[in-house]
From Swiss-Prot:
Family: Belongs to the universal ribosomal protein uL3 family.
Protein name, entry field: Large ribosomal subunit protein uL3
GO molecular function, one term: structural constituent of ribosome
Subunit: Part of the 50S ribosomal subunit. Forms a cluster with proteins L14 and L19.
Protein's job: One of the primary rRNA binding proteins, it binds directly near the 3'-end of the 23S rRNA, where it nucleates assembly of the 50S subunit.
Entry's Gene Ontology cellular component terms: cytosolic large ribosomal subunit
Keyword match Ribosomal protein: yes
Alphabetical UniProt keywords: Ribonucleoprotein, Ribosomal protein, RNA-binding, rRNA-binding
Keyword hit for Repeat: no
InterPro entries, alphabetized: Ribosomal_uL3 (IPR000597), Ribosomal_uL3_bac/org-type (IPR019927), Ribosomal_uL3_CS (IPR019926), Transl_B-barrel_sf (IPR009000)
Record GO biological process: translation
Length: 205
């Protein structure tokens, strides 16, 4: 199991074998192993890795970083692994752990669009545009008065749109630039430019 944390840089294209491949560029790492969790101590196997230097940390976290022998880090994420013994505290993780052609799963956070109506959020058709209609962008009926006299849970209604955790499975690494810590991944990646992304070896690859 390989993993790394990065930030989305943007999209471009790469020419390979006379084909144009749309790619997303991710600036990933370097990351450091901050903590190891085992079944004996925590009930499950995982490692915690850190990314990006932090300016200020509280005393308890300062102790955690000191124990791992790394500088204070801003972003900490946990990844489940089968054998935490394969990793050492303070170990550096860079993009060279991956190779071109590897299949990876990428997790990001979709663009937040705020409070949105049913037409934008769910793609509802809306009401009639003319002939005396006044419900142009409303969602329509949400239930009945007498039975069941309530709105069912999960009903598609207006609300917060976007800013959700999204995972893209089996993306392919097209190119790796070890010197600049860059990974070019085939296709799109969730989130805005500069958004945080988590990369791991594909589970179903």
């Amino acid at each position: 199991m390989k993993m790394i944390i990065g930030r989305k840089v943007g999209m471009t294209r790469i020419f390979k074998d006379d084909k144009v491949i749309p790619v997303t560029v991710i600036k990933a790492g370097p990351c450091y192993v901050v903590q190891k969790k085992t079944i004996d101590t925590d009930g499950y196997n995982a490692i915690q890795i850190g990314f990006e230097e932090a300016k200020k940390v509280n005393k308890p976290m300062e102790g955690v970083f000191k124990k791992a022998g790394v500088k204070p880090l801003k972003i900490l994420k946990e990844f489940r692994v089968e054998n935490p013994e394969e990793f050492e505290l303070g170990q550096e993780i860079k993009v060279d752990i991956f190779a071109e052609g590897d299949k990876i799963d990428i997790t990001g956070w979709s663009k937040g669009r705020g409070f949105a109506g049913a037409m934008k959020r769910w793609g509802f058709r809306g009401g009639p545009k003319s002939h005396g209609a006044k419900f142009h962008r409303e969602l329509g009926s949400v239930g009945q008065h007498s039975e069941p006299a309530r709105i069912f849970k999960g009903k598609k209604m207006p609300g917060q749109y976007g800013n959700e955790r999204v995972t893209i499975l089996n993306s392919e690494i097209v190119k790796i630039d070890v010197e600049n810590n860059l990974i070019a991944v085939k296709g799109g990646v969730p989130g805005a430019r500069g958004g945080l992304v988590l990369i791991r070896t594909a589970k179903r690859g």
